[in-house]
Amino acid sequence: MHCPFCNQTDTKVIDSRLVADGVQVRRRRECQACHERFTTFETAELLMPKVIKQDGTREPFDEEKLRNGLQRALEKRPVSVEAIETALHNVRHYLQALGEREIKSLVIGEKVMEELQNLDQVAYVRFASVYRSFQDISEFRAEIDRLQKKPDETA
């Protein structure tokens, strides 16, 4: 690492510690040439995969699109902004952990539905109705029945 004071490359790490809930490393460094000290922060650069749409086209992952979809489903529901941000983080982390360069939009949609199911079942049904293109009330009823049976299966 170049010293910001004298531009020499011979620096030594004096101290390292985790910050930002373990997502970042703070390093205290000392230049071996001019003996000035400075701080650096390191984070992992994880790239989001490209999204393969249902029609086969590819586009960059758009976090804003994901946020808007969650907010639309959760509109006028008693869910905190923090809970929404946690759900967004969970989806991003899941996609990064897959380690794929490209991922089908179907995988993202299913993960979003999983997160919504844990947050608010009404929002889940709203999202599912659009995502799965419900055509009539019987499809809503079937999804609600499935939701009601799910807790019994895990008990």
Swiss-Prot record:
Keyword set includes Zinc-finger: yes
InterPro entries: ATP-cone_dom (IPR005144), NrdR-like_N (IPR055173), RNR_NrdR-like (IPR003796)
A single MF term (Gene Ontology): DNA binding
Cofactor note: Binds 1 zinc ion.
Domain ATP-cone: 49-139
Keyword Ion transport annotated: no
Zinc finger annotations (unnamed) as residue ranges: 3-34
Positions in coiled-coil regions: none
Swiss-Prot/TrEMBL keywords: ATP-binding, DNA-binding, Metal-binding, Nucleotide-binding, Repressor, Transcription, Transcription regulation, Zinc, Zinc-finger
One GO term (biological process): negative regulation of DNA-templated transcription
TM region positions: none
Cofactor needs: Zn(2+)
Similarity-based family: Belongs to the NrdR family.
Function: Negatively regulates transcription of bacterial ribonucleotide reductase nrd genes and operons by binding to NrdR-boxes.
Descriptive protein name: Transcriptional repressor NrdR
Lineage: Bacteria, Pseudomonadati, Pseudomonadota, Gammaproteobacteria, Cellvibrionales
Gene: nrdR
